């Protein structure tokens, strides 16, 4: 009964809530506030709502991650404790139930990632759009230029050249990533003008740039079931397992994007990556495997002997890095040479010079400080009746549906509390 409309009582005053931004958090906040009995104005400067949402998950929309709260929070490296109340108020199961109730059947895939059965993100956007309309939300395709506040708190927003009065305002403008979808970063500017601390913004869940000359040669090579280790100042920082991709500028893919969220000291630390192409085998077992392969190709040139072990595109690079003459016959390769080959297969180094640009990031790390937001309501501690939801808050997570769940949960909590009637 979470989404039943509340009725207004005689000793309360119906209020107006302005929601800025019609992304995941803003749509959830707007509909939820309307169901509390508020008149809701949803401002979106794009022609269509949910533009960024429509391209998430490569157009499939990874709606959430079907795991319990403790596992969920383990995937939130930045301020996880802030989310206890939000996830308690609107859980992963609540998200799944919500979309099923809106007529969007879901499925759970590897890694507990939840997608619409149709594999079409547009179904999620359309369901939210029709839901907020059904809830009575007024959608205004106008660009908000200012959040209006006086000494006692919020008074409204400036949009379309005029002031729209509002008792409460929810800022759900997202981050600075994917600017082509309309992300401008305006919300951070408004928050600072209203006295909030905005922690430094940077790209997160972003490809990594490498000066390594081998990356362009390996461009387009996709690898599955590999291990990636990131070193910060030569100390092991993070290790992950999964899929990755070589690009003309460096590294990308889910494994790399998740690793990037751990790399937070670009201004004062150096980073490098090591790829283990055969993580299921330790060095001794891999050496045995290589010996077995070699025994079947004794008179073959070394460069032609690795076809069963590696993708074709990778072989010339590994041969070069091993230091073994590509024309040397397999039957003359020494144990020391095999050890050099094993090292390349288990510790393939890639230099990292920096993250990709913030415009290419899936999310923006940093944002309005959680110390200045009430975690049980999402209301500002600085400005009464001002609320925040979604990516604008200084909370971010790994790939896998976690960031969208944060948007649903914080959006719900902000909408629920902002929509409560004022007692007379």
Model-derived segments and spans:
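An anion/pyrophosphate-binding glycine-rich loop and adjacent beta-alpha core
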Residues: 47-55, 63, 69-70, 105, ...
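Glycine-rich active-site loop/strand segments that organize a redox cofactor
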Residues: 60-108
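Glycine-rich FAD pyrophosphate-binding loop
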Residues: 34-58
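Core beta-strand elements of the Rossmann-like FAD/NAD(P) dinucleotide-binding domain
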Residues: 13-15, 159-168, 239-240
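A conserved short coil-to-beta-strand element within the FAD-binding core of flavoproteins
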Residues: 140-153
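Short hydrophobic core segments
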Residues: 18-20, 43, 144, 164-179, ...
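A glycine-rich dinucleotide-binding beta-alpha-beta segment and adjacent secondary-structure elements
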Residues: 140-143, 316-396
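N-terminal Rossmann-like FAD-binding beta1-loop-alpha1 element of flavoenzymes
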Residues: 16-42, 414-419
């Amino acid at each position: 009964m979470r989404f039943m409309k509340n009725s207004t009582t005689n000793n309360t005053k119906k209020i107006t809530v302005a929601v800025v931004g019609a992304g995941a958090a803003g749509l959830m906040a707007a509909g939820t506030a309307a169901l509390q009995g508020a008149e809701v104005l949803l401002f979106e400067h794009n022609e269509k709502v949910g533009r960024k949402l429509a391209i998430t998950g490569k157009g499939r929309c990874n709606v959430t991650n079907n795991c319990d709260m403790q596992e969920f929070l383990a995937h939130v490296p930045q301020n996880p404790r802030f989310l206890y109340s939000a996830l308690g108020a609107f859980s992963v199961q609540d998200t799944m139930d919500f979309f099923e109730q809106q007529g969007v059947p879901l499925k759970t895939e590897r890694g507990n990632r939840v997608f619409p059965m149709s594999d079409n993100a547009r179904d999620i956007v359309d369901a939210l759009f029709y839901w907020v309309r059904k809830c009575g939300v007024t959608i205004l395709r106008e660009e908000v230029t200012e959040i209006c506040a006086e000494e006692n708190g919020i008074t409204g927003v400036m949009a379309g050249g005029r002031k729209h009065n509002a008792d409460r305002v929810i800022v759900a403008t997202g981050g600075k990533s994917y600017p082509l979808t309309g992300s401008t970063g305006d919300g951070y500017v408004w928050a600072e003008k209203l006295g909030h601390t905005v922690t430094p913004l940077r790209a997160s869940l972003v490809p990594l740039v490498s000066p390594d000359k081998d990356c362009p040669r390996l461009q387009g090579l996709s690898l599955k079931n590999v291990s990636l280790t990131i070193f910060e100042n030569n100390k092991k920082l993070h290790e992950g397992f999964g899929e990755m991709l070589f690009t003309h500028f460096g590294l990308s893919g889910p494994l790399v994007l998740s690793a990037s969220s751990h790399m937070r000291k670009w201004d004062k630390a150096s980073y490098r990556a090591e790829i283990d192409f055969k993580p299921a085998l330790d060095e001794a077992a891999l050496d045995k495997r290589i010996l077995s392969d070699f025994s079947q190709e004794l008179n073959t040139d070394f460069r032609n002997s690795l076809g069963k072990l590696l993708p074709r595109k990778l072989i010339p690079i590994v041969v070069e890095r091993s230091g073994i003459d590509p024309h040397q016959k397999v039957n003359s390769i020494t144990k020391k040479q095999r050890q050099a080959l094993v090292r390349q297969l288990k510790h393939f180094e890639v230099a990292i010079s920096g993250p990709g640009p913030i415009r290419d990031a899936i999310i923006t790390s940093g944002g309005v400080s959680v110390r200045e937001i009430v975690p049980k309501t999402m209301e500002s501690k600085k400005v009464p009746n001002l609320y925040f939801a979604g990516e604008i808050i200084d909370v971010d997570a790994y790939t896998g549906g976690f960031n969208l769940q944060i948007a649903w949960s914080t959006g719900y909590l902000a909408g629920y509390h902002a929509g409560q009637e004022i007692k007379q």
